[in-house]
């Protein structure tokens, strides 16, 4: 029997049978994989927390038939600081949804995994405003990493289908406020320093625009509104 070992983050879980659970893990070396955890729901509480959502661990597993079976798990970080802070949990929940939508099973995305791991630790240390801007920069990186680029030839409208910010108005474009254009046009230049970043509402507007862009071009279903419990208007 060949055992496989990798670091990974639990991004989804589904109870299965009387005591089993299937966990979806975004792994460093193998992309997104589903692991069958036998008898975990009948095990002691500590073991259950090791396969809970948003737990970073080293996983050892093997393949049996069409399934990957978890053999051992060594927790690295439970991210309690994220789970116990509602605003940080909102942002983290959205990150998990991005992973679930963007990454296909078995698709190896080591650099993306490393960015996600850094992002989770970044969220712990920073305020909501800076964290929203970090999400925006991550989405910009995703767009570029998937081979797309938003061309800027104006500043009044965002044309999702044409991947451009333009001054030409038609039925396909989205009007841009001046503050929103400033964020979108300088996203790669701005550092993550809170006193240089726009207010939260503008950042959310920018994220939603990127979300619409990614959903259109990558056929995903990102939806920030589902993850905001704090009552932000968007």
Where are these regions (language model features)?
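Non-catalytic alpha-helical scaffolds and adjoining flexible linkers that form interface surfaces
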Residues: 1-21, 26-234
